[in-house]
Amino acid sequence: MLLSENMVELPDDLEWDMIVLDIDGTLLDRDGIIPEMIHIVRELERNGIVVSLASGRTLPNITPIHQSLCISGFIVGENGGMVWDSAKGHPIRALADGSRPKEAAKWLGTQIEGLNPEGIESNRWRETEWCLTEIEDWEAVRDAIESSEWSDISVIPTGFAVHLTIPGHDKASGLRVALEQRGVDPKRVIACGDAPNDIPMFELVGFAV
């Protein structure tokens, strides 16, 4: 099975139950939803493969995309911190506490010249992590965190923002919860993404693109 003419061929030795798509850089570019991806998503759903979304975005940012695509899968937001499977009647679940990353961002604002601890606009809806605006020298943020009382905080650049997350909080942890709710074996799932924050879910599933 091909995702598209320009993408890799998926292994056909298993019957895949689900494809989980990252959003920014995978489903969307800076101009919006990639037109080819709309066709691919709808074709997958017609063929009985559930499409779900896993993103660093907040639920209010992801939900309109999910609805516009008319997909039957769930949402994993905030890099695994939020899980919502409305199609199956499951309530929204917050899997982490974002207060410590937010406090770390405030501290970083006192250490790195020009860094705005308020971060990106969507932080107003963010519950389980904190996001700084994308900066060229994100390693300076990482190095400052590693040598501070906030050394347990992970610093993850995505190309769109720099995420501050607590230990054990990643796309794999959220995806694992969402899959358990549906009784889906992770090894029968394909994950697609393009950034370092996608690596944990790649390691969880049966095939990664």
Where does each model-flagged region fall?
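Non-catalytic pre-domain segments flanking phosphatase-related domains
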Residues: 1-21, 184
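Asp-based phosphoryl-transfer active-site loop
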Residues: 12-31, 202
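Active-site phosphate-binding/coordination module
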Residues: 30-123
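Residue-level detector of anion-binding/catalytic polar loops
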Residues: 50, 207-208
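Conserved acidic, metal-coordinating active-site core of Asp-based
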Residues: 104-205
